């Protein structure tokens, strides 16, 4: 049997690895500008954490979590998302006692048992940010601005930020009843998953991607019409702040997100070209308290790295690499030359190939290096190196002391 990677678990190589690193570096740079601190989370948590936070009735908990038992029979899970673990850490380490509000970001692999397709894997990578302790809508606007800044910095075009408000608990209760009454009337048009969702969490029907369900809910009551005065004011202020920040957005009253913990603001940065959600997030003002912490308003976002990679072009970026070619027994000198160049911040490839100069230079050309550094006995004797520009063919001798 040839050993292959597990279905849905992928290697990231070459140009894709460069795209991955570009996304990570860009997001980290922008999060640093907003003064977020990094938190490094474990990939394994108690399954109960996600059942209580993400929601028992969600597809993630019902169908997609990788759950297993440890040797003591305790149910553990590979994390399907990062917010729940960050909230758990916020409570466990009493971060709420340190300052009035806390801003954290994380990066790493997540795991969901989904059908693999373009931009969607069973192991995928997310970068996310969370703000704890701020209830005001200007925090929502700033979180969305971070998302917009990341996409702009990556040069991703054709992205729209969709927003909605899910209100508070009282708003949700009134809306749930009205929505359930409506869905009962169109029940025959719904898929089997949505019929079962009606009893558990009817809001999830609005998030269904099946075309017949999309048509069925077009005339459904809108959450926006059930917002209390306070939640409506929060939502209107958010829209004003987004306009002030010149962030293009559109309202999507069917946007509910796939996780049960969201309240008030929810948003998605969507690629219309791919039909994929690239970055998503929202408020979860009750989650900290529901998991055993003090009442703490909170909000955040997560971006899917692999999905963003689909939108980045392949870059033929040639690094200024120095390829050191030793001839004969000159390794002591050649290794020292390579070390000197690296200490000066140069990228150096030391040749391990055997063969004549022609073969070595052909290999250097194949690697796409900028310079070949040729070292033979004559160069050692004169304490020099021969540097060849691989693009122009120009060749010159340089003293070791002048490198």
Curated annotation (Swiss-Prot):
GO terms classed as biological process: histidyl-tRNA aminoacylation
First-level EC class: ligase
Catalytic activity: tRNA(His) + L-histidine + ATP = L-histidyl-tRNA(His) + AMP + diphosphate + H(+)
Pfam family, one: tRNA-synt_His
InterPro entries: aa-tRNA-synth_II, aa-tRNA-synth_II/BPL/LPL, Anticodon-bd, Anticodon-bd_dom_sf, His-tRNA-ligase, HisRS-like_core, HisRS/HisZ, HisRS_anticodon
Any single GO CC term annotated in Swiss-Prot or TrEMBL for this entry: cytoplasm
GO MF term list: ATP binding; histidine-tRNA ligase activity
PROSITE patterns, A to Z: AA_TRNA_LIGASE_II (PS50862)
UniProt keyword annotations, A-Z: Aminoacyl-tRNA synthetase, ATP-binding, Cytoplasm, Ligase, Nucleotide-binding, Protein biosynthesis
EC number: 6.1.1.21
Localisation: Cytoplasm
Database matches in HAMAP family: His_tRNA_synth
NCBIfam families noted in UniProt: hisS
PANTHER family: HISTIDINE--TRNA LIGASE, MITOCHONDRIAL-RELATED, HISTIDYL-TRNA SYNTHETASE
Quaternary organization: Homodimer.
Family: Belongs to the class-II aminoacyl-tRNA synthetase family.
Protein name: Histidine--tRNA ligase
